[in-house]
Amino acid sequence: MTEIEKEEACSRLQQHYAQVLSLLGEDPKREGLLKTPLRVAKAMQFLTKGYNEDPEAILRAAMFEEDYQQMVIVKDIDFFSMCEHHMLPFFGKAHVGYIPNRYITGLSKLPRVVDVFARRLQVQERLTTQIKECIQNTLNPLGVIVVIEAQHMCMQMRGVEKQNSLTTTSDFTGAFEESTTREEFLNLIGRRR
């Protein structure tokens, strides 16, 4: 999306958010809300900017040949996303591991991949799988594992209203299908089951 397209989209979003405020019984022209439609439009563009980014290109930009075939883990990756069902935030930590098969990537690239997929309207299950598949398809490692722990505002602010609930998802390929390899990963991230 070009800058002009982004500005046009922001302007249209701003108009729609002003209408939403009116439909909720608010006056979008009152002092406290004058800039709210623009702020919300910009926030939504930021929170969904992952649609305009290529996560595989991020990994390929720092892909190196290396003779290392032990686990590589980046844990406690903070992320936030938006639930596609209610458009409310969910946030938490992602733990990503892979066992290289000739290629490694820059360590900072794994959190960047998490962010690209998280900054879209999501469900946690799909987010977990998309991260795993991106790493598997790009690096072709011996195995990939992703564990995500998150709090969902759609469960805490509305619906069942369970403030201390935590949702955990995992997905894995290759070498991580072996329970001992998975157990090693879980021990290393401090999530032994």
Swiss-Prot record:
GO terms for cellular component: cytoplasm. Gene3D superfamilies: 1.10.286.10, 3.30.1130.10. It holds the Pfam family GTP_cyclohydroI. Keywords: GTP-binding, Hydrolase, Metal-binding, Nucleotide-binding, One-carbon metabolism, Zinc. GO terms for biological process: one-carbon metabolic process; tetrahydrobiopterin biosynthetic process; tetrahydrofolate biosynthetic process. Zn(2+) binds at C83, H86, C154. The keyword Aminoacyl-tRNA synthetase does not apply. GO terms for molecular function: GTP binding; GTP cyclohydrolase I activity; zinc ion binding. It is an enzyme of class 3 (hydrolase). Toroid-shaped homodecamer, composed of two pentamers of five dimers. NCBIfam families: folE, PRK09347.1-2, PRK09347.1-3. This is GTP cyclohydrolase 1. It comes from Porphyromonas gingivalis (strain ATCC BAA-308 / W83). The gene is folE.
